[in-house]
From Swiss-Prot:
Gene giving rise to this polypeptide: asd
Name of this chain's protein: Aspartate-semialdehyde dehydrogenase
Record note on quaternary structure: Homodimer.
Enzyme Commission (EC) number: 1.2.1.11
Swiss-Prot/TrEMBL keywords: Amino-acid biosynthesis, Diaminopimelate biosynthesis, Lysine biosynthesis, Methionine biosynthesis, NADP, Oxidoreductase, Threonine biosynthesis
Functional pathway: Amino-acid biosynthesis; L-lysine biosynthesis via DAP pathway; (S)-tetrahydrodipicolinate from L-aspartate: step 2/4; Amino-acid biosynthesis; L-methionine biosynthesis via de novo pathway; L-homoserine from L-aspartate: step 2/3; Amino-acid biosynthesis; L-threonine biosynthesis; L-threonine from L-aspartate: step 2/5
Family listed: Belongs to the aspartate-semialdehyde dehydrogenase family.
This protein's record includes keyword NADP: yes
Species annotation: Legionella pneumophila
GO biological-process terms attached to the record: 'de novo' L-methionine biosynthetic process; diaminopimelate biosynthetic process; isoleucine biosynthetic process; lysine biosynthetic process via diaminopimelate; threonine biosynthetic process
Amino acid sequence: MSRHLNVAIVGATGAVGETFLTVLEERNFPIKSLYPLASSRSVGKTVTFRDQELDVLDLAEFDFSKVDLALFSAGGAVSKEYAPKAVAAGCVVVDNTSCFRYEDDIPLVVPGSESSSNRDYTKRGIIANPNCSTIQMVVALKPIYDAVGISRINVATYQSVSGTGKKAISELVAQVGDLLNGRPANVQVYPQQIAFNALPHIDQFEDNGYTREEMKMVWETRKIMEDDSIMVNPTAVRVPVIYGHSEAVHLELKKPLTADDARALLAKAPGVTVVDNLSKASYPTAIKNAVGHDDVFVGRIRQDISHPCGLNLWIVADNIRKGAATNAVQIAEILQREFLLKLSLPQ
């Protein structure tokens, strides 16, 4: 019989936190008691889990010794302050922020796509959930990488506003309403108007001209694959879509791979659905395929006419589910099933 765990959700009132609750319930995760946590501003609110209304508790006052596992998605500053406290109290943390992703002794995990040595969850009691855009790309590319190797990845992302949070969703909806009614758009969340627009600017700009979001895809892909030789060249774009991230990916492979062989590899890959029938204009989109689902959807699979070892893909996923909450819960399932009973955490 599986062990039922006491679980805390840090950031339970946010977009990802709410989806944590949904995914835990859908996947019937074995929970004894669940504690929704947020800042003091959210105390007094309730969340629904398994037909029960649960009071949101103040994170600052919570005793993490009550729980076995904590899922964090409340921003990097919150994770930096409270994740070590949770571990010190004997709790294991799955963190959805970028706070710990680049530390050598903290695993960065996409279940099924990470190397075997990146599955040592016991080093510091913290497991990092990768960036949403990295997750969906790595899930789709891992079968190809295993088969023929990958030398270079060129990727352009088309990322929905839900990746920024609830305020960004509200701003997009408000801007559309204002503009359609002849009023100027009120710009607060993004540096420029997002409605009817595309912004090649996600996170801060780095000294090399790339954004932090783009560099996340470089660092994280290499860490997950444990292959620093992979060259990754991203351009991250925010688009006026509420849910679902899309990516145009162009690969330089170490050996040639036909489009048919790539489809066959991907069709067998866990967590991947191929949608690629051009005669029926069938290719994946955020609205039709990704939103509300946990798979990564791949289409427009074709050999690159400009390179003998080139392959092009279109990759779509729900950024709040597989790109965040579902991936974290899948990590939690591995912990619960394989590791949690034998963790030896630092004191």
